[in-house]
């Protein structure tokens, strides 16, 4: 089998590349996905409110686990990643958050990454998006990904939480992806107008999968990339339960889009990475790149949970006797409780003036429950998800075997810097202040977690060690740049090799201020044009907010 391009991983970026490259009918593409199809009849992935279900099994989730995290009481922590057409866009929380403009401007400060500035990237965010309330300078109107904005009157807790943030002195913003990210406001979501999850399989592959020049193979576990000298010339994979490898040749390029955990793992198995690590497993060295698998970053978050005095939370939706009605309303009408992920309000703030742009993110949820659906509080409640955005802590991904079915060693080194602890203490104390504003007096009952007795630095730190969780945003393990630890250049091409690119969240040099899916899609769109030799979309002229030393909040 021969193709022009072989794409490894049908996730948020891989599906973008498969769709854009096959717009040219003379270009042939093979798309390999280790998981299965995105079954449209499976409510677990298609119903927005069911977002916790895919994380509870292994059909759609790689269900990775970290090594014992040394600063988190040696907990082995969850590291869920999507498996199946859509990748992590098939199982994520559907929050459409692009990050802060200054995140990308910060990337562009690196030599030869100048064209990754916010205004250079904004046209590609817009290209990917169809926003339900229409396009403007910041949002697209005819892209593959459906984005739904929160509408007034969904739940009184959303508006009360935004109002409480304003009463605490923080700004309101009507668009967290628009002119000003900083502040509290409604959150955009990747949900279709018919109340279905808008994964990249739905948005991109649905329009491309019938093209004769696109071949999609599911249940295809990539073993390694095949090299001829320093040039990638093909891929070898295992189909289903077979132990007999299948091969295909790439006439032009191999495009690795397997995500921040699997992309470095595949490179290492293919002979690209740290020479000492590869020698441990007798893997012939193709090219030494010490940065492969290093620079691992993530967002850590915790929940502050409160009793709700008014019966307006989603607690009734957790009762089994209400779920058939909710399911029917969603299935036949695309409406109701099932049609939302219920992360419809949130915000970004600076916890201290030393931060030039927001370093703390909030998601508000009108029910008290863990992200993966466990430990639901058995009463009306609500919670704030809060966490820091740009931790200085760095971890790694390293193979533990040549066997493609064996998970790699993953260590995030969460909370390994003093800055981490200061930010989380600040986050808890600021959140409590917001929760005690008059806007929430009508609804706020007792603090369920961490509980009012948890006050001192030592008590707060212990709460974080025991209860903070991943926000499922790993990135950075094949970072873009030109220093000695960089893996790819500004076009995703792997340093020192030919015919091989990495295109996914692993190439982010530094984690962004917000959820990763929207920016991963943007990366796919931008590099697709580079691969095709197309001129970049014209740079945007839209304005954007920069604090420039403004106080973090208004004085009361």
UniProtKB/Swiss-Prot annotation:
Family membership noted in the UniProt record: Belongs to the GMC oxidoreductase family.
Subcellular location as annotated: Cell membrane
Write out the residues that bind FAD.
4-33
What's its catalytic activity? choline + A = betaine aldehyde + AH2; betaine aldehyde + NAD(+) + H2O = glycine betaine + NADH + 2 H(+)
Q: In which pathway does it act?
A: Amine and polyamine biosynthesis; betaine biosynthesis via choline pathway; betaine aldehyde from choline (cytochrome c reductase route): step 1/1
Which membrane topology describes this protein?
Peripheral membrane protein
Transport found in the keyword field: no
Q: What does this protein do?
A: Involved in the biosynthesis of the osmoprotectant glycine betaine. Catalyzes the oxidation of choline to betaine aldehyde and betaine aldehyde to glycine betaine at the same rate.
UniProt GO BP: glycine betaine biosynthetic process from choline
The organism encoding this protein is Escherichia coli O6:H1 (strain CFT073 / ATCC 700928 / UPEC)
Which cofactor does this sequence's record say it needs?
A: FAD
Which key words tag this protein in UniProt? Answer: Cell membrane, FAD, Flavoprotein, Membrane, NAD, Oxidoreductase
Q: What class of enzyme is it?
A: oxidoreductase
Show the HAMAP family listed in the entry: Choline_dehydrogen
The record's listing under SUPFAM superfamilies reads:
FAD-linked reductases, C-terminal domain, FAD/NAD(P)-binding domain
Which gene holds the coding sequence for this protein? Answer: betA
Q: Name one GO cellular component term.
A: plasma membrane
> Its Gene Ontology molecular function terms?
betaine-aldehyde dehydrogenase (NAD+) activity; choline dehydrogenase activity; flavin adenine dinucleotide binding
Residue numbers annotated as active site: 473 (proton acceptor)
Known EC number: 1.1.99.1, 1.2.1.8
Alphabetical list of InterPro entries matching this protein: BetA (IPR011533), FAD/NAD-bd_sf (IPR036188), GMC_OxRdtase (IPR012132), GMC_OxRdtase_N (IPR000172), GMC_OxRtase_C (IPR007867)
For this entry, the protein name equals: Oxygen-dependent choline dehydrogenase
């Amino acid at each position: 089998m021969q193709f022009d391009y072989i794409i490894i991983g049908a996730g948020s970026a891989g599906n973008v590349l498969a769709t854009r490259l096959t717009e040219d009918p003379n270009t042939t593409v093979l798309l390999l996905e280790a998981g299965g199809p995105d079954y449209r009849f499976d409510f677990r992935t298609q119903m927005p409110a069911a977002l916790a279900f895919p994380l509870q099994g292994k059909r759609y989730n790689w269900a990775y686990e970290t090594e014992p995290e040394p600063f988190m009481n040696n907990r082995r922590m969850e590291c869920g990643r999507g498996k199946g057409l859509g990748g992590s866009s098939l199982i994520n929380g559907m929050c459409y958050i692009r990050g802060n403009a200054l995140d990308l401007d910060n990337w562009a400060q690196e030599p030869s990454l100048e064209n990754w500035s916010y205004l250079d990237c904004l046209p590609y965010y817009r290209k990917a998006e169809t926003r339900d309330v229409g396009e403007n300078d910041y949002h697209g109107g005819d892209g593959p990904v459906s984005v739904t904005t929160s509408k007034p009157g969904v739940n009184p807790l959303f508006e009360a939480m935004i109002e409480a943030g304003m009463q605490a002195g923080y700004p309101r913003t009507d668009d967290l992806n628009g002119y000003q990210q900083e502040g509290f406001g409604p959150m955009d979501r990747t949900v279709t107008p018919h109340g279905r999850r808008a994964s990249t399989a739905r948005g991109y592959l649905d329009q491309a999968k019938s093209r004769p020049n696109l071949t999609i193979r599911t249940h295809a576990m990539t073993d390694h990339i095949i090299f001829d000298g320093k040039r990638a010339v093909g891929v070898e994979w295992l189909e289903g339960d077979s132990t007999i490898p299948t091969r295909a040749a790439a006439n032009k390029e191999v495009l690795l889009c397997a995500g921040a955990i699997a992309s470095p793992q595949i490179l290492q198995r293919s002979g690209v990475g740290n020479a000492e690590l590869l020698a441990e497993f007798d893997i012939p060295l193709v090219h030494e790149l010490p940065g492969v698998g290093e620079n691992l970053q993530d967002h850590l978050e915790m929940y502050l949970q409160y009793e709700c005095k008014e019966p307006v939370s989603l607690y009734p939706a957790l009762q089994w006797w209400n779920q058939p009605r909710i399911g029917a309303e969603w299935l036949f009408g695309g409406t109701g409780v099932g049609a939302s992920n219920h992360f419809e309000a949130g915000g970004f703030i600076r916890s201290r003036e030393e931060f030039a742009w927001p370093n703390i993110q909030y998601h508000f949820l009108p029910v008290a429950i863990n992200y993966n659906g466990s430990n639901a509080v058995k009463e009306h409640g609500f919670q704030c998800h809060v966490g820091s955005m740009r931790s200085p802590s760095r971890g790694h991904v390293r193979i533990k075997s040549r066997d493609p079915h064996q998970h790699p060693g993953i260590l995030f080194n969460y909370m390994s810097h003093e800055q981490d602890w200061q930010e989380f203490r600040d986050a808890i104390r600021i959140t409590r202040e917001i929760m005690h504003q008059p806007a929430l007096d009508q609804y706020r009952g007792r603090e369920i977690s961490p509980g009012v007795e948890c006050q001192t630095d030592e008590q707060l730190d212990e709460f974080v060690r025991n209860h903070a969780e991943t926000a499922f945003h790993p990135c950075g393990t094949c970072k873009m740049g030109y220093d000695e630890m960089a893996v790819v250049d500004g076009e995703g091409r792997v340093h020192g090799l030919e015919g091989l690119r990495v295109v996914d969240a692993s190439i982010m040099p530094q984690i962004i201020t917000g959820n990763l899916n929207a920016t991963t899609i943007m990366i796919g769109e931008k590099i697709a044009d580079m691969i095709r030799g197309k001129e970049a979309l014209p740079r945007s002229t839209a304005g954007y907010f920069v604090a420039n030393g403004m106080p973090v909040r208004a004085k009361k």
